[in-house]
């Protein structure tokens, strides 16, 4: 059997199974997002495969299926709306009678109570016609402190010696700068501050604005001695706490790691593990007191804002991608480092090779390197 025939057969099989699966109900109190700090992108992905219904794959930023997502299609010509609920595989099955161009919106509950997910208001229009059968939409957390999910600007800078130092330790000031760069311009403006609450963060320090802004936003805290210790290496626990404060929720559940029971950052670490942002090691440990490396910071930040590049994502613009001599393409962090250090335009691609097992994997496909990105080195 030819490879293309196998793929068609596999996709047809999963669609038939998915149509029979029950859908998960959205909580009664779920409401659409009211701020524009979330993202949804709908892109044609599989051509020439004819199936009985249009299929919209709904995915959370953590790459998990958005089971129970409520999808609203608004006809751009008539204004009429229809709603569809994604099944446990994250598949919303849409009748083929709905021909036209639609604005797509989706909402769902997250894996932790109190966290809602939504697509970006005014997402890329979805065109339903005889040629398109399979599309996708990505949902992100609705946060009070908005992150820039849409613009894939570089947020990490290399060193003067030409290296990026993926295995080097990263300081508290440096991760504050990274989180500052990942904020939307509106968020940075809302929390803008240069008034330091810390004795060791001077007005002339290169990181003053970043640290003061994050402090005002409630993402960072200092030490009992009144200092921030900006040049100290940040631990995995400390960085987890900074990120988890974005979600403004507490999580009391099963401990995810062997070595975090009773740790001061246990709740923060569990939140990030539940959301797929923090990964443990092969022994089931989070290593909370270990210094964070630059590669680990890049990987966590990419998961935080839903950036999902692989080694082949940037193939179409490989000649213009900035590489690093110490970022080997065989390293586990290779794509994460390139994602963090290259500003780029992109589309989404979906991998349906493992669709029968419910493993729809959404990855980026870079289209060009951006030249309009902020210059964080200034």
Q: What name fits each language-model region?
A:
Residues 6-15, 20:
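Sec-dependent N-terminal signal peptides
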Residues 28-54:
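Beta-strand-rich domain onsets/edges
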Residues 47-70:
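Structural motif
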Residues 77-91:
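Short, acidic Ser/Thr/Gly-rich low-complexity loop/linker segments typical of extracellular
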Residues 89-105:
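Short Pro-Gly-centered beta-turn/loop motif in secreted/extracellular proteins
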Residues 105-123:
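A short, solvent-exposed loop/turn motif at the edges and junctions
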């Amino acid at each position: 059997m030819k490879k293309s025939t196998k793929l068609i057969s596999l996709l047809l099989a999963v669609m038939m199974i998915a149509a029979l699966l029950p859908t998960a109900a959205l909580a009664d109190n779920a409401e659409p997002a009211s701020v524009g700090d979330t993202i949804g992108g709908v892109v044609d992905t599989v051509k020439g495969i004819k199936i009985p219904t249009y299929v919209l794959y709904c995915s959370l930023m953590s790459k998990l299926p958005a089971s129970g997502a409520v999808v609203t299609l608004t006809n751009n010509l008539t204004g009429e709306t229809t709603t569809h609920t994604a099944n446990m595989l994250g598949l919303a099955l849409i009748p083929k009678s709905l021909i036209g161009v639609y604005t797509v919106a989706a909402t769902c509950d997250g894996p932790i109570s109190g966290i809602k997910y939504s697509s970006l208001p005014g997402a890329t229009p979805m065109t339903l016609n005889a040629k398109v059968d399979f599309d996708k939409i990505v949902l992100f957390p609705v946060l009070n402190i908005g992150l820039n999910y849409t613009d894939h600007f570089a947020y990490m800078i290399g060193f003067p010696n030409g290296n990026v130092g993926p295995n080097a330790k990263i300081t508290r000031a440096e991760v504050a700068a990274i989180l500052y760069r990942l904020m939307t311009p509106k968020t940075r403006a809302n929390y803008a501050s240069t008034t330091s609450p810390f004795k060791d963060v001077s007005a002339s320090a290169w990181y003053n604005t970043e640290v003061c802004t994050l402090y005002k936003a409630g993402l960072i805290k200092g030490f009992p001695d009144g200092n921030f210790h900006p040049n100290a290496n940040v631990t995995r626990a400390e960085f987890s706490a900074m990120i988890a404060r974005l979600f403004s929720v507490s999580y009391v559940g099963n401990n995810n790691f062997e070595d975090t029971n009773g740790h001061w950052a246990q709740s923060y670490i569990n939140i990030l593990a539940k959301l797929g942002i923090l990964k443990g090691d092969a022994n089931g440990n989070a290593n909370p007191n270990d210094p964070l490396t630059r590669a680990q910071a890049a990987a966590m930040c990419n998961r935080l804002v839903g950036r999902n590049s692989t080694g082949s994502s940037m193939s179409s613009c490989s000649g213009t991608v900035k590489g690093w001599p110490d970022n080997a393409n065989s390293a586990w962090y290779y794509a994460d480092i390139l994602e963090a250090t290259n500003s780029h335009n992109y589309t989404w691609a979906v991998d349906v090779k493992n669709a029968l097992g419910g493993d729809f994997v959404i990855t980026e496909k870079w289209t060009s390197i951006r030249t309009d990105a902020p210059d964080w080195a200034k």
